[in-house]
């Protein structure tokens, strides 16, 4: 068992309970989906909702866009994902 209260996690008792309850409530498809990141090939709301609902992705890497476009994309994804997503970016060119 992983000690989630120790380095590098430092989770509280409530945080540990959330993690344990969340994992216990996940289907096998949801657990597998958490291993994958989507490359954000579209910012259309219907596509974004389908991606999190069908594939249960663990995160997304956004493509170059305005701050407002990236914000809206992430808002839609987070609001429709059962589990908070990790958001990644391409920062070697300043985050695009």
List each language-model region with its residue ranges.
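N-terminal beta-rich core of secreted/periplasmic extracellular enzymes
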Residues: 1-96
């Amino acid at each position: 068992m992983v000690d989630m209260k120790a380095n590098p996690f430092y989770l509280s008792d409530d945080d540990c309970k959330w993690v344990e309850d969340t994992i216990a409530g996940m289907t096998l498809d949801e657990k597998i989906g958490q291993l994958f990141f989507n490359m954000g090939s579209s910012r259309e709301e219907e596509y974004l909702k389908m991606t999190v609902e069908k594939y249960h992705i663990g995160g997304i890497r956004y493509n170059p866009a305005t701050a407002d476009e990236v914000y809206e994309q992430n808002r839609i994804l987070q609001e429709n994902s059962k589990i908070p997503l990790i958001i990644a970016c391409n920062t070697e060119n300043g985050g695009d």
